[in-house]
Amino acid sequence: MYNASFYPTPPEVAEKMLAKVGKLYERSILEPSAGKGDLADAAVGKLDRYYNRCREVVHCIEIEPELQAAIRGKGYPLVGTDFLTFWPDEKYDLILMNPPFANGDAHLLHAWEILDHGDIVCLLNEQTLLNPCTSNRKLLATIIEEHGEVEHLGSCFAEDALRKTQVRVSMVHLRKKREEPK
């Protein structure tokens, strides 16, 4: 049905992710590798009291056609298909992401690159952080050290998740400050 790297974000994990960023209104939000839009749904749940058309402020990217249809069916703008080649036309200040565990480091580094300013909250395979054996992982470790924090969540896709895995997961929160004019 879906590809092997599709692990929808459990609702309780999505809530933890949103708690890292506080208020969501007046934010431009992107969920790359959105799957069926679980993080977008969680954000809209928080925004619903502020906006009548809150689904329009949460944009999604998804590579799988079946999942794209699910996202469109929920009313979210699909602004791209392959996140690793995506360059936004607008500036996002919040990126919520649960990328494929196999190359989550590349996804998070790309998110950092396209983020104008603001926050990224990302789920990664814990080994991506504990075993910095590649240049991407080393760069990511430096960015986290300078701009963020990590919370190890353990096997949060093992119990009540739609798709289960014993992969241990970490939540990374990065904050990029607005660049000062030169």
Describe the residue ranges of each PLM region:
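Class I S-adenosyl-L-methionine-dependent methyltransferase catalytic core
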Residues: 1-182
